[in-house]
């Protein structure tokens, strides 16, 4: 990937970069830079999205073009801006939509993409808007990465972005947090507890860092299989993002939703998000999931 000079500058947050992209003179120029940013975003977030391979549209290998019927390299208006192959071999076609003022892309704009990417396992809409068409939530194969995801990116991400687009090691500025003293005490007591008991419970107040404390406990125990249960999709996303960012050993995850209507009434709970806004692959086939989690013999 050859990155534009605009991306090679050092930014501190997404609004600053977004403003710079908005200042470009044409919609095509803005779209091109956003596609480059999206490619870099996925490259930095490979653990989060379980990415084995990623290609911008022009670089998609012929074997994948043929397998997923994405047209040839000269077919530039296919609606698919890039392709991801996950660690477990799933295919994700993605399309980038940048709009000044964070205007939501229309249903008509997205239907061509959904049509052209229909032979992939998933279609992911990447947009700088707060939402896309509600019809996207009707299909469990649709994923979304939106403005809220970009707004939450921290300084460390943009340090990595700067290194990546300037051909440096994107991980050289990676910062791994260390537990506070009270978290060290929690970790120690949990390890001692599990040495003599099969069950335990940690009760801690909000804001005490339970998400990362749980990760450090898992790493200290050298656990091979972890079941994480959450009451909302947004909490699943929050935990997955934190663990993917801070895990010192790469891990594979499997997101399971109770059913495909779990987020059908999210207007009643402003704190939650739709399943598609989880942004990662997931499924509802419980029997298969139980098989995956069952210990293998031999």
Task: Please name every model-derived segment.
Residues 2-14, 22-23, 27-29, 56-73, ...:
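SF2 helicase/translocase NTPase motor core
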Residues 19-24, 79:
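Short linear interaction motifs
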Residues 29-118:
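Catalytic centers of nucleases
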Residues 97-98, 126-130:
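Structural motif
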């Amino acid at each position: 990937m050859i990155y534009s000079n605009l991306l090679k500058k050092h930014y501190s947050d997404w609004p600053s970069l977004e403003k710079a992209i908005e200042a470009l003179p044409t919609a095509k120029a803005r779209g091109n830079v956003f596609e480059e940013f999206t490619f870099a975003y996925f490259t930095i977030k490979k653990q989060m999205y379980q990415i084995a391979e990623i290609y911008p549209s022009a670089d998609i290998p012929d074997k994948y073009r043929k397998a997923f019927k994405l047209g040839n390299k000269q077919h530039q208006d296919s609606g698919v801006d890039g392709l991801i192959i996950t660690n477990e071999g799933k295919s994700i076609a993605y399309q980038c939509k940048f709009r000044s003022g964070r205007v939501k892309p229309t249903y008509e704009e997205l239907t061509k993409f959904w049509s052209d990417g229909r032979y992939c396992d998933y279609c992911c809409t990447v947009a700088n808007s707060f939402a896309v068409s509600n019809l996207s939530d009707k299909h469990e194969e649709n994923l979304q990465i939106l403005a809220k995801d970009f707004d939450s990116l921290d300084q460390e991400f943009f340090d990595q972005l700067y290194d990546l687009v300037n051909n440096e090691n994107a991980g050289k500025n990676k910062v791994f947090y260390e537990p506070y003293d009270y978290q060290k005490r929690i970790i120690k007591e949990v390890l001692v507890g599990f040495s003599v008991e099969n069950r335990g419970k940690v009760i801690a107040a909000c804001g005490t860092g339970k998400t990362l404390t749980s990760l450090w406990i898992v790493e200290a125990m050298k656990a091979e299989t972890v079941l994480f249960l959450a009451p909302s999709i947004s909490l699943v996303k929050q935990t997955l993002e934190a663990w993917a960012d801070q895990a010192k050993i790469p891990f594979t995850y499997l997101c399971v939703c109770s059913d495909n209507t779990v987020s059908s009434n999210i207007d009643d709970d402003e704190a939650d998000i739709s399943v598609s806004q989880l942004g990662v692959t997931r499924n509802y086939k419980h029997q298969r999931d139980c098989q995956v989690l069952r210990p293998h013999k031999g």
